[in-house]
From Swiss-Prot:
Listed GO CC annotations: cytosol
GO molecular function, one term: RNA binding
Name of the protein this chain belongs to: Ribosomal RNA small subunit methyltransferase A
UniProt keyword list: Cytoplasm, Methyltransferase, RNA-binding, rRNA processing, S-adenosyl-L-methionine, Transferase
Amino acid sequence: MIRPRKVFAQHWLKSEKALDAIIKAAECTESDRSPKGDCILEIGPGTGILTRRLLPLVQSLIAVEIDRDLCQLLSKQLGKTENFLLLQGDFLTLDLPSYLVAFPNFQKPNKVVANIPYNITGPIIEKLLGTIANPNPEPFDSIVLLVQKEVAERLYAKPGSKTFGALSVRVQYLAECELICTVPASAFHPAPKVDSAVVRLRPRKIEIPALNPRQLETFLKLGFGAKRKMLRNNLQSVIERDRLSHLLEQLKINPQARAEDISVQQWVILANELAVASGEQGVGNR
């Protein structure tokens, strides 16, 4: 048995209950995009406990693993499975479309199902969804991830809650986020110091595009930079307080509101109005 390596933040999932929840959330079925079944991308398959559960349910599964020892183990155990493709490398730097050119039997994945390393959760989600300025032009149907519970709470947080922050806005601008279940630390070997949670992201068409996505990013950084302060104080470096207060009233936003009190759509509308007022409209996204 290969021991988990700290350098890759490895923790082996051992809970059948958690595996069942992940499989159910993935909703592996035939669809218009994949009439023969789903094509799954798994990031960090580890010893393959989730991989083995998924393979009989899908058309194909592409696993990306950075650990060479685990790649050897998976190749030995699953290498002859026709619908399984293993790629050794760092997912964050991997150009998956270029790799798949050499494997015509494996089409572009339409879903992601993964127990990802918690220390690179943010970069992984950004690569899967894109950013406010550059959304993924070919979004996945769904993304099911096992992440740190604290991060999950920020992903699906609602306006007005203490956990609603810039990450909440960035992710919810691009996708609907749903909490599937929580997973205790005891479900892993070795047990991490934190509990975990399964979340499902469904990329969506952006309802109100940001006129200047980069400016929206700037407003989010400023707005959430000091969460205890009122928004009009945090944004006074880019717009006069009185002018901002008037604009907030026009948008039916409480002038005394803090950053976490404003919904995703309100953030976009506010940024768009400020962009128009300052003459800094850019090119919107999809």
